[in-house]
């Protein structure tokens, strides 16, 4: 039986054969870094879920306008609901990484998946919030907000919560980008100083 450490004919170890050594200080820094990412994802989830709920419950009766009558408000609801689901999934992968000390998928796929989806969903929230803010401003100039102040106020709150979710997801995207850069430079998602 061949020894797992004996390489023949100039073979080199693959990334799977390569284990990363981390000192206690480095392990603590990695734990703090992963905790910060988990906290950002939790904040993104909270704000996007709150925005979706505020938009979903924004109806005052049959005489009042409904959120689903406006394309931009439907966009805000759907975008924030998608980001809330994505954030729950990403929080699960963070917890998996804490408990198992490995990624859910192969490392190369995981870092690119996180970064790419953080980018796409950040832009989705930004575009939904921008479209809804423009509509809310237009409505404020017309008769809609003078007759239905509560509807406009709740729409503004939902839009603001969506922008807050965007900010936290954008910060999370920066950390995911840092992981991609570390992966490209060192072959691992771990920090450059490990």
Curated annotation (Swiss-Prot):
<dbReference type="InterPro" id="IPR006459">
    <property type="entry name" value="CASP/CASPL"/>
</dbReference>
<feature type="topological domain" description="Cytoplasmic">
    <location>
        <begin position="96"/>
        <end position="114"/>
    </location>
</feature>
<protein>
    <recommendedName>
        <fullName>CASP-like protein 4C1</fullName>
    </recommendedName>
</protein>
<keyword id="KW-1133">Transmembrane helix</keyword>
<keyword id="KW-0472">Membrane</keyword>
<dbReference type="GO" id="GO:0005886">
    <property type="term" value="C:plasma membrane"/>
</dbReference>
<feature type="topological domain" description="Extracellular">
    <location>
        <begin position="57"/>
        <end position="74"/>
    </location>
</feature>
<feature type="transmembrane region" description="Helical">
    <location>
        <begin position="75"/>
        <end position="95"/>
    </location>
</feature>
<feature type="transmembrane region" description="Helical">
    <location>
        <begin position="36"/>
        <end position="56"/>
    </location>
</feature>
<feature type="topological domain" description="Cytoplasmic">
    <location>
        <begin position="179"/>
        <end position="194"/>
    </location>
</feature>
<comment type="subunit">
    <text>Homodimer and heterodimers.</text>
</comment>
<keyword id="KW-0812">Transmembrane</keyword>
<keyword id="KW-1003">Cell membrane</keyword>
<feature type="topological domain" description="Cytoplasmic">
    <location>
        <begin position="1"/>
        <end position="35"/>
    </location>
</feature>
<feature type="transmembrane region" description="Helical">
    <location>
        <begin position="158"/>
        <end position="178"/>
    </location>
</feature>
<feature type="topological domain" description="Extracellular">
    <location>
        <begin position="136"/>
        <end position="157"/>
    </location>
</feature>
<feature type="transmembrane region" description="Helical">
    <location>
        <begin position="115"/>
        <end position="135"/>
    </location>
</feature>
<dbReference type="Pfam" id="PF04535">
    <property type="entry name" value="CASP_dom"/>
</dbReference>
<comment type="similarity">
    <text>Belongs to the Casparian strip membrane proteins (CASP) family.</text>
</comment>
<dbReference type="InterPro" id="IPR006702">
    <property type="entry name" value="CASP_dom"/>
</dbReference>
């Amino acid at each position: 039986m061949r020894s797992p450490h004996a390489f023949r004919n100039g073979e080199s170890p693959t990334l799977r054969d390569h284990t990363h050594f981390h000192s206690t200080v480095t392990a603590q820094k990695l734990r703090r870094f992963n905790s910060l990412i988990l906290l950002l994802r939790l904040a993104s989830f909270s704000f996007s879920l709150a925005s979706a709920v505020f938009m979903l419950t924004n109806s005052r009766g049959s005489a009042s306008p409904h959120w689903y009558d406006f394309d931009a408000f439907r966009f805000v609801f759907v975008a924030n609901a998608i980001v809330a689901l994505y954030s729950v999934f990403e929080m699960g992968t963070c917890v998996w990484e804490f408990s198992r000390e490995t990624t859910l998928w192969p490392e190369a796929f995981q870092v690119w998946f996180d970064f790419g989806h953080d980018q796409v969903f950040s832009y989705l929230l930004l575009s939904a919030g921008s479209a809804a803010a423009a509509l809310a401003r237009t409505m404020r100039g017309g008769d809609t907000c003078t007759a239905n102040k509560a509807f406009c106020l709740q729409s503004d709150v939902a839009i603001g919560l969506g922008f807050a979710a965007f900010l936290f997801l954008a910060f999370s995207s920066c950390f995911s980008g840092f992981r991609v850069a570390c992966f490209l430079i060192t072959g691992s998602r771990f920090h450059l100083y490990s």
